[in-house]
Amino acid sequence: MSQVESMLYAEAPHVTSGQGGASRTSLMQRVAICFAAGAVGGLAVVLFSHLLFALGVSAAFGVTAPVPLKSPDVYRPLFWAGLWGIPFGLLIKPVWSRLYLAGLLYFLAPVLALFTIFLPLSGAGLFGLQHGGPTFTAYLVLVNLPFGITTALVARAIIGKNP
């Protein structure tokens, strides 16, 4: 076998590490992992909205119903959350030593986009103030809190000790 063939067909090192491994992941692997982790983070937000609704907290903020759990309504927030996991995958290596803090704060990125782009485009105004006033804005911050930390927890569980 020539040197080129041996390089082409050489067994690639194991790069995903789970809980205990010390291997490193590539950028594409981190992005893919964080897409999946973001989707799980989105599921946490949807389930948290149902919890807040069941506890009566949503009504105090003027929200009348949580995100439906039936198809196809549930897929949109999961897909968008997965997309928001991609930038987290790009940032995960430099913030690895403070991953959970970064995850906790990362929920602000999609919330800021929601407040300044998506809500105004939907007619709810900047920060959703035309839809329900400041209480609606506060509710959106509250309901989205689980996104970043859940994304970080899931990414850490899949990647292991070293990104």
Language model feature labels by segment:
Residues 2-163:
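Juxtamembrane/disordered regions of integral membrane proteins
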